[in-house]
């Protein structure tokens, strides 16, 4: 256990760097879209196909990665994911034609589905009482990666061209693969769970299909899987279409527009940290605490975002404040849901459980912008935002209620089963 304590912060730092640079690589294609379209002389529909390919491949492979992470060495698989990221991004950089580019960009989705293993490994390095904060810190890589990707695309893209930007981020993936192999070590699954944390040596539990199928018998998990589909709609619709909404329907431009985007992204990052910390604190007081906090944050965020949409174009300051604060509260959900899934899932199937959640959320993430575009075609983006936010919340709340009603007993059941194994090690 002493070795785990000594190494865990180094492991977290390396995995955070992996997540940060990987998210930057995933998100910088947005700012580089125009340059890529000009290079291959393609239209928006063709570019959309290139973007959708990676999402589709990643979604299909979530269960595969989850299974592999539960069966084999997690650090080696994460290093493999980093190497795949580097290689596929490099191939994208040297694509001679549009067809080749679509294929290579789709292949970048292979490594996008590797995050369940990252969270599973960290769950075995850090105690349950601080899992929310650890997950929140790792998820901070998403908004920071967005900023880093935009910065790289703006600074390097204009000077070096989009191909060299991809070469740079591809090389980063290969370097990260080496760092992961050097600094990250696997630990026994369940090493930090109550009843096991004081043991020096633990024989890891083995994956079994019976245990994996048992995930669907936990009411809390099923409810969290279902809510994950609806919960991602509002934040992904707003994130995907916010720039165009601000530019076209509200008439904002230049530095002010970029300022709103930056503040919103930073608010998301801050909300992740506060939500994770408060969720951990309440979880120690009451097993339902983290979930209560996540639900409250989502509801507050929804109300504030809708209020922002009803502000006048001239009241830009109030609009900016409401969007930023709404994003802050909406971010409370993510680390708490992830921590709850980890607390309920047995260690030997934790990656599989997280992969199921990721698959469902990815499906919602892919559909949300399309639904918004279809609604906007009949009215406008503002109306589409309001309809999607309200409908998603109405569908999400019952799932939240079911999870809230069962989370305490499900966590206690998992802990009891783990304690019953203690005498066997």
Regions found by a protein language model. Name each.
Residues 52-65, 262-275:
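Central cavity-lining transmembrane alpha-helices of secondary-active solute carriers
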């Amino acid at each position: 256990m002493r070795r785990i304590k000594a190494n865990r912060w180094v492991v977290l730092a390396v995995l955070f760097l992996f997540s940060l640079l990987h998210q930057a690589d995933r998100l910088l294609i947005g700012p580089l879209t125009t340059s890529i379209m000009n290079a291959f002389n393609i239209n928006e529909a063709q570019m959309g196909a290139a973007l959708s390919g990676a999402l589709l491949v990643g979604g299909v492979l979530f269960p595969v990665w989850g299974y592999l992470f539960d069966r084999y060495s997690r650090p080696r698989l994460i290093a493999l994911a980093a190497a795949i990221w580097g290689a596929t991004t490099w191939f994208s950089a040297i694509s001679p034609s549009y067809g080749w580019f679509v294929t290579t960009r789709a292949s970048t989705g292979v490594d996008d589905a590797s995050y369940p293993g990252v969270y599973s490994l960290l769950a075995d390095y850090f105690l349950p009482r601080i899992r929310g904060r650890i997950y929140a810190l790792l998820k901070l890589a998403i908004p920071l990666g967005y900023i880093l990707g935009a910065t790289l695309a703006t600074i390097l893209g204009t000077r070096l061209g989009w191909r060299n930007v991809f070469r740079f981020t591809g090389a980063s993936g290969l370097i990260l693969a080496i760092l992961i192999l050097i600094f990250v070590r696997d630990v026994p699954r369940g090493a930090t769970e109550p009843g096991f944390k004081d043991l020096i040596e633990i024989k890891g539990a083995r994956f079994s299909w019976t245990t994996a199928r048992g995930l669907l018998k936990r009411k809390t998990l099923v409810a969290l899987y279902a809510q994950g589909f609806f919960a991602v709609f509002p934040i992904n619709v707003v994130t995907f279409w916010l720039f165009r909404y601000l530019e076209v329907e509200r008439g904002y431009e230049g530095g002010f527009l970029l300022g709103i985007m930056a503040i919103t992204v930073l608010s998301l990052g801050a909300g992740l940290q506060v939500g994770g910390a408060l969720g951990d604190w309440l979880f120690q007081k009451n097993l339902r605490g983290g979930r209560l906090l996540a639900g409250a944050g989502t509801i507050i965020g929804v109300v504030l975002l809708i209020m922002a949409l009803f502000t006048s174009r001239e009241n830009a300051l109030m609009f900016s404040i409401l969007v930023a604060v709404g994003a802050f509260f909406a971010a409370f959900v993510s680390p708490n849901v992830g921590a709850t899934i980890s607390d309920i899932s047995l260690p030997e199937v934790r990656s599989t459980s997280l992969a199921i959640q990721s698959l469902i959320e990815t499906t919602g993430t892919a559909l949300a912008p399309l639904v918004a575009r279809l609604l906007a075609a009949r009215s406008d983006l503002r109306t589409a935002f309001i309809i999607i936010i309200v409908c998603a919340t109405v569908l999400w709340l019952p799932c939240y209620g079911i999870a809230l009603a069962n989370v305490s007993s499900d966590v206690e059941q998992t802990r009891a089963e783990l304690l019953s194994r203690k005498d066997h090690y």
